[in-house]
């Protein structure tokens, strides 16, 4: 190691003289000398240039110490103590050998330079000597005066150059001495650092022994922890293996379910296609049904319009029937009043007749006693009594009703209120519109009139109890002709009194109404009227024709509209009706009859009294 360091230093000095100064300067830059330290330049070569020693100030450098500390820290942490001590010894030996080599080379170089200056022997390769020779050659011969002067001047110039070179050499020597001082300081500091490092290493050794003693316990605890962690690791591995098995099973189950779901999806897709096809078919069918429904709705609207017309017609007929019923009720009241008057008159006539009979009996007895001379007068008196006892003839009280409305009813199934109802063929009710009887002189005074009044009352009651309507106009009036009984002015004279009997005019055939065929529901108003008329004919024959006010109904022809289907979506609601006049008339009629009966009874009792 010493030979290598010496050879490297020798090569450096041989290459360039100025390199030593640079090298010394670089080494000085790494020194740790403090500011203000002075180094004396007293040396054995001080005699070369007299004068006081040069004092040099060395600048401190902290980077080297910090880098050395960092390096030592890394080495301390990486290498053992014995190796570090051995390396420190090697470093000290190398540094000492380097210092010896540097001092020897420096002395040798200084001796060579001083010897050259003293002997003035210049080397051929010296640039200054070459310049001097060139100058002499240019100036001429040395013998001449001018050349001698020029030679003297050249010599002076050479001396100046030599002095400059000497000055440079002195400066270089002073720099080398300062470098030497710096290196000595660096070595001193390095020795101090080495001693400090040894102390730290000893302390670290003691600490390491203590740490090792404590580390045994820690190692034992760590060993226990390691065993525990190994057991936990084995358990975790077993659990991981178990979880892997479970995962494999789950993957198999997942694959099975995936295939199953795929099949289900395919089946659902096929089912969806079928449903879509069925949906399309049902859509077409619904469109057809909607079209049919629209047609049926249009047809039902047409039928509803017809039903509305029929309803209006039936309502008009009902109004007319109510008017007719009201008129008949008024007529019934008038007839009851006339009946009461006639009953009073009949009672008066009966009383007079009884009185006349008693007188006649008395006269007859007187005539029998008087003789047969008065036979003619007795015969006349008997004839008068027979004629007087006879009832006055009944007049024609028949009411000729001229119908004004015809109903073309169409059999339609629907609401029953206010709308004509249909019946099956063959259920036509034929009733006699007019009950006829042979005309002639009546034999009873009260019975025909009572029968007519009873018949009228039956018709009125039946009309009040029914709710259907018919269209008819009431025309004409009932003429009641009272038979005037001629009473002789003087019964005592026994004159023949003749009472002419006026035959009532029979109704003309032109005014008689034919029987009407009524196409209505069984149990209706007209059926009740016909039944009442038939019962009246069978029980009490009328001497005069009594027509029933039944309006004829025209039967629809064979080519009329047929029966439409029922209308489930649009039922016709009949309008709300006010209380009919027939109901009000029935109430007022019954009250009027009761009043007339009471008045008749009161008058009869008053006369008897």
Curated annotation (Swiss-Prot):
A Pfam family this chain is assigned to: CortBP2
Ranges of Pro residues composition bias in the record: 563-574
Primary location recorded for the protein, binned into one broad class: other
Positions in coiled-coil regions: 182-264, 303-370
Residue numbers of Phosphoserine PTMs: 586
One Gene Ontology term from the biological process aspect of the record: positive regulation of Arp2/3 complex-mediated actin nucleation
Record's compositionally biased regions (Polar residues): 1-10
Keywords associated with the record: Cell projection, Coiled coil, Cytoplasm, Cytoskeleton, Phosphoprotein
InterPro entries cross-referenced by the UniProt entry: Cortactin-Actin_Reg, Cortactin-binding_p2_N
GO cellular component: actin cytoskeleton; cytoplasm; FAR/SIN/STRIPAK complex; lamellipodium; stress fiber
General remark: Named 'Nausicaa' after the princess in Homer's 'The Odyssey' who helps to ensure Odysseus' safe passage home from Phaeacia.
Function: Regulates lamellipodial actin dynamics in a Cortactin-dependent manner and is therefore likely involved in controlling actin branch density, actin-retrograde flow rates and lamellipodial protrusion. Functions by slowing the dissociation of Cortactin from Arp2/3 nucleated branches thereby increasing branch nucleation and junction stability. Associates with core striatin-interacting phosphatase and kinase (STRIPAK) complex to form CTTNBP2NL-STRIPAK complexes.
Protein's name in the database: CTTNBP2 N-terminal-like protein
Protein source organism: Drosophila melanogaster (Fruit fly)
């Amino acid at each position: 190691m010493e030979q290598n360091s010496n050879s490297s230093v020798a090569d450096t000095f041989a290459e360039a003289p100025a390199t030593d100064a640079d090298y010394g300067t670089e080494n000085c830059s790494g020194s740790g000398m403090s500011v203000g330290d002075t180094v004396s330049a007293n040396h054995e070569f001080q005699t070369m240039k007299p004068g006081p020693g040069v004092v040099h100030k060395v600048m401190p450098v902290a980077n080297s110490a910090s880098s050395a500390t960092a390096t030592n820290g890394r080495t301390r942490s990486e290498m053992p103590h014995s190796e570090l001590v051995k390396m420190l010894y090697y470093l000290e030996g190398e540094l000492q050998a380097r210092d010896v080599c540097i001092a020897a080379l420096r002395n040798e170089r200084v001796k060579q330079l001083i010897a050259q200056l003293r002997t003035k022997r210049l080397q051929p390769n010296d640039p200054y000597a070459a310049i001097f020779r060139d100058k002499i050659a240019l100036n001429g011969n040395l013998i001449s005066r001018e050349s001698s002067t020029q030679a003297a001047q050249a010599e002076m110039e050479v001396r100046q150059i030599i002095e400059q070179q000497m000055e440079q050499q002195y400066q270089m020597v002073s720099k080398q001495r300062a470098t030497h001082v710096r290196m000595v300081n660096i070595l001193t500091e390095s020795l101090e650092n080495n001693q400090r490092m040894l102390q730290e290493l000893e302390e670290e050794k003691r600490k390491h022994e203590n740490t090792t003693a404590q580390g045994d316990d820690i190692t034992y605890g760590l060993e226990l922890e390691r065993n525990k962690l190994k057991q936990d690791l084995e358990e975790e591995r077993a659990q991981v293996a178990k979880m892997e098995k479970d995962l494999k099973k789950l993957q198999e189950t997942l694959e099975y379910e995936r295939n199953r779901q795929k099949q289900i999806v395919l089946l659902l897709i096929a089912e969806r296609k079928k449903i879509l096809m069925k949906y399309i078919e049902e859509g077409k069918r619904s469109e057809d049904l909607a079209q049919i429904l629209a047609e049926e709705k249009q047809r039902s609207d047409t039928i509803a319009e017809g039903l509305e017309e029929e309803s209006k017609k039936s309502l008009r007929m009902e109004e007319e029937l109510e008017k007719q019923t009201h008129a008949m009720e008024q007529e019934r009241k008038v007839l009851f009043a006339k009946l009461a008057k006639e009953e009073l008159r009949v009672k008066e006539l009966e009383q007079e007749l009884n009185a006349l009979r008693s007188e006649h009996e008395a006269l007859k007895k007187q005539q029998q006693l008087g003789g047969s001379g008065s036979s003619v007068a007795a015969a006349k008196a008997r004839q008068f009594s027979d004629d007087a006892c006879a009832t006055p003839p009944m007049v024609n009280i028949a009411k000729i009703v001229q119908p004004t409305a015809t109903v073309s009813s169409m059999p339609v199934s629907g609401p029953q209120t206010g709308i004509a109802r249909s019946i099956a063929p063959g259920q036509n009710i034929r009733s006699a519109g007019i009950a006829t009887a042979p005309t002639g002189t009546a034999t009873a005074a009260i019975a025909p009139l009572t029968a007519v009044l009873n018949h009228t009352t039956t018709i009125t009651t039946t009309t009040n109890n029914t709710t259907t309507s018919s269209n008819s106009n009431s025309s004409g009036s009932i003429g009641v002709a009272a038979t005037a009984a001629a009473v002789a002015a003087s019964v005592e004279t026994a004159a023949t009194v003749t009472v002419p009997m006026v035959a009532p005019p029979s109704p003309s055939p032109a005014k008689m109404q034919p029987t009407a065929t009524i196409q209505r529901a069984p149990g209706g108003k007209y059926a009740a009227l016909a039944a009442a008329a038939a019962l009246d004919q069978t029980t009490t024959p009328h001497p005069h024709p009594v027509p029933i006010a039944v309006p004829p109904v025209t039967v629809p022809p064979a080519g009329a509209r047929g029966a439409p289907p029922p209308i489930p979506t649009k039922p016709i609601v009949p309008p709300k009706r006010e209380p009919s006049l027939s109901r009000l008339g029935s109430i007022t009629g019954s009250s009027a009859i009761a009043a007339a009966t009471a008045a008749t009874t009161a008058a009869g009792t008053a006369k008897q009294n």
